[in-house]
């Protein structure tokens, strides 16, 4: 969308603006031309240095949304190394995982905790495979510090990674019962998994984790998707 706006602002002749824009190839956009053909442009270029993107919290853009109805969300990383065909993030364009720096995340957590209304207890983390990386362990330490200082967040909403479960359990232990361990399978049918290009953690590995999960008192949940290719 920002690419379209930028192209519009570059137009000097407003009377011909619509016609000129419809004949352009604008990155990350599909445009219907004046001749009714579609122009497919190059995919969007992903920023490698995520900290170049201004923080919507630290710049004050999110202040009006601390309204007692919405849960704050932060993002520590972008990208996903997996290629599940049902997922928009399974594209080759986003397989590289990039992270925001820990200093920025620490400031965002402090900023949110100081402003979140008393009736809001949940913090969302919109990473695709939270707990799979070393930086996530450090982030959990920061969140634990914020919890001790502000008694927030009492609950975390995260999507934990489907592999490296032992590492994820170490991460989850730092946050106690504030977070649940997600062990999504999407399907247990091997032919369906092949169709959607997904490799689940093996059943043997899953069962090996059971004693550790019970000992730690972790809450768990799973997810399945109905109607995947080959389901019926």
Q: Which residue ranges define each predicted feature?
A:
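Glycine-rich beta-alpha loop elements in corrinoid/cobalamin-binding modules
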Residues: 1-45
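Catalytic palm subdomain of template-directed nucleic-acid polymerases
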Residues: 231
């Amino acid at each position: 969308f920002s690419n379209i706006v930028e192209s519009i602002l570059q137009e000097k002749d407003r009377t011909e603006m619509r016609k000129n824009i419809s004949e352009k190839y604008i990155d990350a956009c599909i445009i219907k031309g004046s001749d009714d053909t579609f122009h497919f442009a190059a995919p969007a270029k992903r920023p490698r240095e995520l900290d170049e993107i201004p923080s919507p919290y630290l710049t004050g853009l999110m202040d009006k949304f601390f309204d007692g109805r919405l849960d704050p969300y932060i993002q520590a990383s972008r990208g996903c190394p997996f290629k599940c065909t049902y997922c928009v993030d399974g594209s080759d364009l986003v397989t590289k995982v990039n992270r925001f720096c820990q200093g920025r995340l620490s400031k965002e957590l402090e900023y949110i905790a100081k402003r979140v209304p008393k009736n809001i207890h949940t913090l969302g983390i919109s990473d695709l495979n939270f707990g799979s990386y070393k930086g996530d362990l450090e982030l959990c330490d920061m969140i634990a510090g914020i919890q001790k200082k502000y008694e927030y967040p009492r609950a975390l909403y995260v999507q934990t990674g489907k592999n490296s479960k032992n590492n994820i359990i170490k991460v989850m232990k730092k946050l106690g019962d504030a977070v649940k361990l997600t062990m999504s399978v999407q399907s247990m049918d091997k032919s369906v998994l092949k169709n959607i290009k997904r490799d689940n953690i093996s059943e043997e590995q899953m069962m090996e984790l059971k004693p550790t999960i019970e000992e730690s008192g972790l809450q768990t949940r799973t997810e399945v998707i109905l109607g995947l290719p080959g389901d019926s």
